[in-house]
Regions:
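Core alpha-helical transmembrane segments of integral membrane proteins
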Residues: 234-243
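Positively charged n-region of N-terminal signal peptides that target proteins for export
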Residues: 1-5
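Bacterial N-terminal signal peptides
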Residues: 6-17
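Soluble extramembrane regions of membrane proteins in the secretory/endomembrane system
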Residues: 20-234
Length: 243
């Protein structure tokens, strides 16, 4: 009888421990968490700004626990980037940028405004000098304001601002990162990791969710509406001169 009781106690204790371990594992990997994945693609312009305003407001209203911005953009309008940066900074939800291809110019500014940055192995970020629509360098006043904005974005997320400044100011000298004086800084994933501009390098979304301990979270993928697609097309700087 005593042996039987000991066996039952052992079985119960083992089962209880496994149950607790399983529950803790679920919590640790995002069980009952809600994650919004919002794309930042193509040019940064007013249409993208409106899309991000709508989707981040929706994420907030739905009680999202995390927002992931999947970034692939060559850059775009400085004014729209500034407004989107404010939208991101005003969020009370943890944010992560996943650079799937490139976050150049205004794209790097947006990434720097998020809490975390992860990069695909072939991704790049930087090259953020301000140019006019005809491809010439902007005036000194505009350049100075943009450099200050890049610095502020880096500082807001606890990153060393000298690299953000070098992305926007070709007068900086960082030859060890392939950006001697006269060149804008562009970071590879390994370089971004080295200077503290990326938390990790991941090949896909599954790996990213694992790194963020959100593997078991409920995922909501945001997408543009037809009206937003039209608005983005009409706001494209290539299209505007034709209209």
């Amino acid at each position: 009888m005593r042996f039987f009781i000991l066996v039952m106690v052992f079985i119960y204790t083992t089962f209880f421990s496994l149950h607790i371990s399983f529950a803790e594992n679920n919590v640790r990997h995002g069980e009952n968490k809600l994650v919004y994945i919002i794309p930042i693609e193509r040019e940064v312009e007013r249409g993208l700004e409106a899309f991000l305003k709508r989707t981040t407001e929706e994420a907030t209203e739905e009680g999202a626990n995390h927002i992931i911005f999947e970034i692939d953009t060559p850059g775009g309008r400085v004014d729209s980037a500034s407004q989107i940066g404010k939208i991101i900074n005003n969020l009370d939800i943890p944010t992560t940028s996943y650079i799937v291809n490139e976050a150049l110019s205004a794209g790097s500014y947006l990434a720097l405004n998020t809490d975390n940055i992860y990069m695909h192995p072939q991704a790049t970020m930087g090259a953020s000098g301000v140019i006019t629509q005809d491809g010439n360098a902007a005036d000194k006043k505009a350049q100075s304001a943009w450099i200050a904005a890049m610095q502020s974005a880096a500082e807001s997320s606890g990153r060393d601002p000298k690299y953000a400044i070098a992305m926007a100011d070709a007068e900086q000298d960082l030859p060890e990162l392939g950006a001697p004086k006269g060149e804008f800084l562009t970071l590879s994933p390994s370089e971004a990791l080295e200077v503290g501009y990326a938390e990790g390098i991941v090949t896909n979304r599954v790996e990213l969710l694992h790194e963020l301990q959100l593997t078991n979270a409920t995922i909501v993928e945001s997408d543009t509406t037809l009206a937003e697609d039209v608005a983005r097309f009409l706001a494209n700087p290539v299209v505007i001169p034709i209209l």
